[in-house]
Amino acid sequence: MGRINTKVPPVAAFYDDLAPHYHLLYVDWERSVAKQGEALASLLSAFGVTVADPILDAACGIGTQTLGLARLGFNIAASDISLMAVERLQQELVQRGLSARTRVDDLRTLAQVESSSLAAILACDNSIPHLLSDRDILQAFRTAHRCLRPGGLLVFSVRDYAALPRVNPDVRPYGLRHRDGCRFLAVQVWEWEGEQYDLSMYLTSESSSGECNTKVLRSRYYAVSIERLQSLLAEAGFVEVERHNDILFQPVLTARQRVV
């Protein structure tokens, strides 16, 4: 019988279950890896971060950003709260002949990162809104501030919730994919409750014989506004807080550790 770990945080459990399928949420994951790597490399370079500087992808998932930057030669480490996502990233690195230090860690604490040790920290793909309160988000920002060296750069991407209509329930299909002779369909359902919403991810696989299997993964998000995030960044001690709309498919926020 498999072990059941009752101590796994809900967000970690969600991404543990999603890790084998995550690439299928993209029309072409390999292309997205390359495209996002190039976009982030240009952004980092514009802020003076070089390939030799120490960088942490602190919400790495299965490696959509880490793999692209590692392929371009960046000195990148990667962490995530999901063990299964980190293990999937390790497999992807080996398959590509790439190298990056990987570990399980919590974005709110980054307990394994030394203070003032990093030139840049990344947290992309709407990872911040998994933190369900301003208090938790502020803790994550203060932790990033601790880990960055003077002048260091924080980069994260989020949904612009203020621009989204509130439909309840909100059904969001990803589209049909094909894998190993099977058809795969992923659908998100958002159910709003105030400024938060429960997300149900329906993953359906159809075999060549027509047999279907559906698994439902559940998580919760805080629809925090970009304006509020900018305020929390300033409260955490960051300066030069900027929004960029032309880097990734979601808005990107950058902020710097003050130069002493």
Q: What is each PLM-predicted segment?
A:
Residues L44, Q90-L93, L233:
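Conserved hydrophobic residues forming the short capping helix/wall of the S-adenosyl-L-methionine
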Residues Y222-V260:
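C-terminal lobe and adjacent flexible extensions of AdoMet/dcAdoMet transferase-like proteins
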Residues V155-E227:
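SAM-dependent methyltransferase
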Residues T64-T109:
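Class I SAM-dependent methyltransferase SAM/SAH-binding core
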Residues Q112-I121:
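A short acidic, Gly/Pro-enriched loop at the edge of an enzyme's catalytic core
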Residues L138-P150:
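A short glycine-rich, Lys/Arg-flanked "PGG" loop and its adjoining helix->strand segment in the class I
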Residues G2-G61:
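Conserved class I S-adenosyl-L-methionine
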